[in-house]
Amino acid sequence: MKSFCLLTLFLFISPFVTNAQSMDELLSSYVPATLKNPEGGKFNYRYSTPDKMEKGTKYPLLVFFHGAGGRGNDNKGQLVDAGGIGAFDKAGLTSRRNSHVFAGQVPKGERWVDVHWSLLGHKMPKVSDSMRMALEAIDAYASDEKNQVDPKRIYVMGLSMGGYGTWDAIQRRPDFFAAAVPICGGGDKSFGEKLKGLPVWAWHGDKDRVIKPSRSRDMIEAIKKAGGNPKYSEIKGRGHNSWTDAWNSKEMWEWLYSQKRR
């Protein structure tokens, strides 16, 4: 697990953010916030709004589930993890696509989904505290009228631990999201029928030794068997960093933001 975290930390530095100043500038464009519930729990998240918003217009929202390296309580790591913040800037999410971006943070020692990543399969467990509060925070953000979120264009994406989170979120809410991009994650194959109508594009490296590519293959196959038409990109020679391929794919971003829930 230590080597995995170090790999994640190394990878975020090089592909998408070049220096500390750039990182600080990008982070400053994301507003820090915390959801608190009556039971005393709290959930940290950051959000960024479209660069230009006009009254009466609705805008898309991208929900991002970070990987294990982004855990903590600094309300920064979730965007620094694997270079997500730089990738989103490069893709022009808030500028060219006029999109909201929402990124919550899992505390250290916790997970989006309470299953071990080395498993070759799992049944969907009880919702984790982090996932439950993330969904509550997303609901609050999306329903806030001042944010002008288009409920038919809410997208979800996540990598590694967040890839599991992405599958978990769409399994729990197959009719909430307009499209999903789970990257090197895994889900519950028995949900193929419920997910057959949701646009999904999964990514995995064929040399991934942290989370086996069979986890993505199995989910895609389950959806296809149920009559769905998911997309799947398995990157030849790639280890546990297929998010670099996904984020560098202009086709993926175009596909994602063209989706609209019926």
Features from the language model and the residues they span:
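Bacterial Sec-dependent N-terminal signal peptides
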Residues: 1-22
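A domain-start/cap signature at the N-terminus of enzymes
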Residues: 18-61, 99, 130-133, 137, ...
